[in-house]
């Protein structure tokens, strides 16, 4: 593969996102941030590191290609140093390879793997690096992890070739829709379920109201501020700031705010059932029904794979949700939500989260 397109200073601003564990990130940051500061100054690349209360963190490198790969090489060298240090008093017979994970849009993985795996095989053979593309997307995102292992130079060459493939794919067929970036979850985050009970999430599952942007490997603005929510066992939960706001609204029996802006979906913003009390406490509330109209091309994100998402929404809200069969000639599907006013409101909220994540319609509060 010709990596001259990278070596020759291609006129693009490249962004590489790495997924690392906290200990690795700590080493890269260094004492009082001295190590990462040195990397920034010597490479000329922008190096951003996601918030520190997560077991996993995203390191984003952005800038001209020569700056990016200089910073990348410095990170690889640092990881290599850490392995050498750990081997000093070790009785292990073999030295482990440097291993890292790239985070890339799932839409690019097909081109990267190639027909029958030919492209990924070519990259492995030409660079000597071990490369594995994850089969599943990272939680609550449209991105996958690519694990690369080997000696430093092999890894650097491998990442260059991966970027070349992605650049070529972009130039031939620009992506459709948005990329929902992966956001590692905090290790302990207050959440609330229907019924009012507080919990703290400590597992590996999380959900986010992501900063959605039509970004690929080349977007320098990928690290925008997220709007976060958290999950336990894969179920949506309401973040604490929103919880306080919604609790106040419930006490005032005011209308539930469905969106931060106009979604264009009939029945979602215009219809807001009154919240009659704190969620889950009014078990004897009168059962009512509410109908939504959702475009056919978005109904899939509400249903989820094998109905997983719609079942989450049902369990979280306590509402019954029925999606009508498609009607010939119609571009919309009818969704009927039945339950108490509070459960309907929560179901609407969760549906709107799914739609906003899919379309990028969620603004900042």
From Swiss-Prot:
Domain comment (free text): The KH domains mediates poly(C) binding.
Modified residues (Phosphoserine): 173, 189, 272, 364-365
PROSITE patterns the UniProt entry points to: KH_TYPE_1 (PS50084)
CDD domains from the UniProt entry: KH-I_PCBP1_2_rpt1, KH-I_PCBP1_2_rpt2, KH-I_PCBP1_2_rpt3
GO cellular component terms attached to this protein's record: cytoplasm; cytosol; extracellular exosome; focal adhesion; membrane; nucleoplasm; nucleus; ribonucleoprotein complex
Keyword RNA-binding (UniProt): yes
Subunit structure: Identified in a mRNP complex, at least composed of DHX9, DDX3X, ELAVL1, HNRNPU, IGF2BP1, ILF3, PABPC1, PCBP2, PTBP2, STAU1, STAU2, SYNCRIP and YBX1. Interacts with IFIH1 and RNF135. Interacts with MAVS (via C-terminus) and ITCH (via WW domains). Interacts with CGAS; preventing the formation of liquid-like droplets in which CGAS is activated.
Protein name in UniProt: Poly(rC)-binding protein 2
PTM notes: Phosphorylated. The non-phosphorylated form(s) exhibited the strongest poly(rC)-binding activity. (Microbial infection) Proteolytically cleaved by picornavirus proteinase 3CD.
Entries under InterPro entries matching the protein: KH_dom, KH_dom_type_1, KH_dom_type_1_sf
Site description Cleavage, by viral proteinase 3CD, residues in chain: 253-254
PANTHER family tied to this protein: KH DOMAIN CONTAINING RNA BINDING PROTEIN (PTHR10288)
Covalent cross-link (Glycyl lysine isopeptide (Lys-Gly) (interchain with G-Cter in SUMO2)), residues: 115, 185, 322
SUPFAM superfamilies given in the database record: Eukaryotic type KH-domain (KH-domain type I)
Signal peptide as annotated in the record: none
Subcellular location field: Nucleus; Cytoplasm
Alphabetized UniProt keyword annotations: Antiviral defense, Cytoplasm, DNA-binding, Host-virus interaction, Immunity, Innate immunity, Isopeptide bond, Nucleus, Phosphoprotein, Repeat, Ribonucleoprotein, RNA-binding, Ubl conjugation, Viral RNA replication
GO MF terms, alphabetically ordered: enzyme binding; lncRNA binding; mRNA binding; promoter-enhancer loop anchoring activity; RNA binding; single-stranded DNA binding; ubiquitin protein ligase binding
Protein function: Single-stranded nucleic acid binding protein that binds preferentially to oligo dC. Major cellular poly(rC)-binding protein. Also binds poly(rU). Acts as a negative regulator of antiviral signaling. Negatively regulates cellular antiviral responses mediated by MAVS signaling. It acts as an adapter between MAVS and the E3 ubiquitin ligase ITCH, therefore triggering MAVS ubiquitination and degradation. Negativeley regulates the cGAS-STING pathway via interaction with CGAS, preventing the formation of liquid-like droplets in which CGAS is activated.
Tissue: Detected in all tissues examined.
Ranges for domain KH: 13-75, 97-162, 287-351
């Amino acid at each position: 593969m010709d990596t001259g397109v990278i070596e020759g200073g291609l006129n693009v601003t490249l962004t590489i996102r790495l997924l690392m564990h906290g200990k690795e990130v700590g080493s890269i940051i260094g004492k009082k941030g001295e190590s990462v500061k040195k990397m920034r100054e010597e490479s000329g690349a922008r190096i951003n590191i996601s918030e520190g209360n997560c077991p996993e963190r995203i390191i984003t490198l952005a800038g001209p290609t020569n700056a990016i790969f200089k910073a990348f090489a410095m990170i690889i060298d640092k990881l290599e140093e850490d392995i050498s240090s750990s081997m000093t008093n070790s009785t292990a017979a073999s030295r482990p390879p440097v291993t890292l994970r790239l985070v890339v849009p799932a839409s690019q993985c097909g081109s990267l793997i190639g027909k029958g795996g030919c492209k990924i095989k070519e990259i492995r053979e030409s660079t000597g690096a071990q490369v594995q593309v994850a089969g599943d997307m990272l939680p609550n995102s449209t991105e996958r992890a690519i694990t690369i292992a080997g000696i430093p130079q092999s890894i650097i060459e491998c990442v260059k070739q991966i970027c070349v493939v992605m650049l070529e794919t972009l130039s031939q067929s620009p992506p459709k829709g948005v990329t929902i970036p992966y956001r590692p979850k905090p290790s302990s985050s207050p959440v609330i379920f229907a019924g009012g009970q507080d919990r703290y999430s400590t597992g590996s599952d999380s959900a986010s109201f992501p900063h959605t942007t039509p970004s690929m490997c080349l977007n320098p603005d990928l690290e925008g501020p997220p709007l976060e929510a958290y999950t336990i066992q894969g179920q949506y939960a309401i973040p604490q700031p929103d919880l306080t706001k919604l609790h106040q609204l419930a006490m005032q029996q005011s209308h539930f705010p469905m969106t931060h802006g106009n979604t264009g979906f009939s029945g979602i913003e215009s219809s807001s059932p009154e919240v009659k009390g704190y969620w889950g406490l009014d078990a004897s509330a009168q059962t009512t029904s509410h109908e939504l109209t959702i475009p056919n091309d978005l109904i899939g994100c509400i249903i989820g794979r094998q109905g997983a998402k719609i079942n989450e929404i049902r369990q979280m809200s306590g509402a019954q949700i029925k999606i009508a069969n498609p009607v010939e000639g119609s571009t919309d599907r009818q969704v009927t939500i039945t339950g108490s006013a509070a459960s309907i409101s929560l179901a609407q909220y969760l549906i709107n989260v799914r739609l906003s994540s899919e379309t990028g319609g969620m603004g900042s509060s």
